[in-house]
């Protein structure tokens, strides 16, 4: 499986958010989209998921445009994990997860053994079995994100697109989710994930795409992309980079305002 975007341009009114962006993801690799807030990472992810049309350029899945593939087939080939999610879904968690795998079923009583196994595996992997009879309105932000991850995993899609899946999670669940995403990639799924934590991006992603100033500043292996010079170019501040006990870290240097005497 290969998803490829070529010469993507995205505008907001008269302002160009992204220009001439090329990106591809293949089966078995985990690609991280990183960059400052407002750089267009989520918008690009939505374009890859066929949830937003680009103003220029095209996206193809195995050589076919997403329009030619069609929504029904795309719902089986591409799973999309949105940030936050709708907390007002009234159904139980187990039904919500099943809906990810069976979006076109009117009822879920006729699940096949394969469906049941995929749903159960997804709920176990995302650690939401204990939440199965609750609704989203009664869950914390981190619990909701894990439910949405289970919903995406249940699809068993060729491509998984995840928008900041660890943003609302505690450190333990951040590591568990990132490990789960990497294991999913190792099992043959292409994974694209939007991240702000550069340390997690360096530890878990095979390739990184650094987006800023309307385009791609750099893409490649973490060691190449996460250089102080490139991070400074993207974020507009000098970065301190290093390794502590085998774990990479990336921190902006402290910016101190000038001291002024108060009259």
Describe the predicted segments one by one.
Residues 160-164:
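Catalytic Walker B motif of ABC-type/P-loop ATPase nucleotide-binding domains
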Residues 34-36:
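The feature captures the beta-strand-to-loop junction immediately N-terminal to the Walker
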Residues 57-65, 74:
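Conserved ABC transporter NBD signature motif
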Residues 234-263:
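ABC ATPase nucleotide-binding domains
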Residues 98, 113-131:
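Conserved ABC ATPase "signature" region
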Residues 49:
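Helix-to-loop junction immediately C-terminal to a conserved catalytic motif
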Residues 110, 135-139, 143:
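Conserved ABC ATPase signature
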